[in-house]
Amino acid sequence: MDYSMSTALYDIDYGMSEPCQKIDVKQVAARLLPPLYSLVFIFGFVGNLLVVLILITCKKLKSMTDIYLLNLAISDLLFLLTLPLWAHYAAAEWDFGGAMCKVFTGMYHMGYFGGIFFIILLTIDRYLAIVHAVFALKARTVTFGVVTSGVTWVAAILVSLPDIIFTRSQKEGFRCSCSPHFPASQYQFWKNFHTIMRNILSLVLPLLVMIVCYSGILKTLLRCRNEKRRHRAVRLIFAIMVVYFLFWAPYNVVLLLNTFQEFFGLNNCSSSNRLDRAMQVTETLGMTHCCINPVVYAFVGEKFRSYLSAFFRKHVAKRLCKHCPLLPRETPEPASSVYTRSTGEQEISVGL
């Protein structure tokens, strides 16, 4: 789990000028986090599992965008599968041993970074489809999507390695913890590196890519003659950027303040406790982005919603209502090449 999140679960923090009691923070976490994590897990798991099932059974992964959407959903599922254990950890202690501590820490961070990287790829994919449409016909193939997805997973594993290596389960006070333990001689370096890397990769880089790509997309869309579709596309772009910023910026700001408490004059017990509580709230807020991803990247497409309706008619309605009137048959999609435009692209004809 994230470094700053785990520190809030200790009874005492000896990093202050004098020992700082963390019992109140632990009690708040024990009451607040388990139900919040459970809600995020339920809604996020259902939404992302539906995306995976529809992409595989209905869309058949016919485009590069489908490949990226599938991997984004898998990243979110990997991340979400760790939440039940973190919920138990917040309420009690780590009861699952050292091996599980490392495994679930790895799943958490690979899902976290993988999700961010695939959002970046989807942003670039949309940019190519709209701004460089001719080039995109040759470049945006299923094969290229599979290759870049493989490279992206390798990158997600590499940036997760420090957390996997330094995280371990051990007895801390009266409870067993699962948290990072940096070498004492390099403690400050690794703590600062961890925070700066996370801020760059999860906030600065995605927002920079979004600003550059969506600025180019907006310039192209403003020349679109279909005013209704143009306005819909502009609203969608604005919503994607605002949602990402609102969900992840608070967490990254609090993480920065928490790591550099002395620099910001916050290295006292009361400030540390407030930052720990803020970390609990903002990280949970960031986690809920996993529930939003299926909506803004998949279900917003009219064609994807038709696949969702067909999926429920075929796999759910028939089982729940065996004696209902004959359900309308789904219309098969005409065969298409690897260059077929994806769900979001069909929605406004150019890539969103």
UniProtKB/Swiss-Prot annotation:
Q: How is it modified after translation?
A: Sulfated on at least 2 of the N-terminal tyrosines. Sulfation is required for efficient binding of the chemokines, CCL3 and CCL4. O-glycosylated, but not N-glycosylated. Ser-6 appears to be the major site. Also sialylated glycans present which contribute to chemokine binding. Ser-17 may also be glycosylated and, if so, with small moieties such as a T-antigen.
Location of Phosphoserine modifications: S336, S337, S342, S349
What is the annotated localization of this protein?
Cell membrane
PROSITE patterns (alphabetical): G_PROTEIN_RECEP_F1_1, G_PROTEIN_RECEP_F1_2
Entry's Gene Ontology molecular function annotations: C-C chemokine binding; C-C chemokine receptor activity
Q: What is this protein called?
A: C-C chemokine receptor type 5
Annotated transmembrane regions: 31-58, 69-89, 103-124, 142-166, 199-218, 236-260, 278-301
| Major subcellular site | membrane
Q: How does it assemble?
A: Interacts with PRAF2. Efficient ligand binding to CCL3/MIP-1alpha and CCL4/MIP-1beta requires sulfation, O-glycosylation and sialic acid modifications. Glycosylation on Ser-6 is required for efficient binding of CCL4. Interacts with GRK2. Interacts with ARRB1 and ARRB2. Interacts with CNIH4. Interacts with S100A4; this interaction stimulates T-lymphocyte chemotaxis.
This protein's gene is called CCR5
> Looking at the Swiss-Prot or TrEMBL record, what is one Pfam family this protein matches?
7tm_1
Disulfide links within the chain: C20-C269, C101-C178
Q: Which residues carry this modification: Sulfotyrosine?
A: Y3, Y10, Y14
Residues where lipid is bound covalently (S-palmitoyl cysteine): C321, C324
Q: Where is this region: Disordered?
A: 332-352
Instruction: Tell me the protein family, please.
Output: Belongs to the G-protein coupled receptor 1 family.
InterPro entries linked to this entry:
CCR1-9-like (IPR050119), Chemokine_CCR5 (IPR002240), Chemokine_rcpt (IPR000355), GPCR_Rhodpsn (IPR000276), GPCR_Rhodpsn_7TM (IPR017452)
Regarding the membrane, this protein is recorded as: Multi-pass membrane protein
Presence of keyword Metal-binding? no
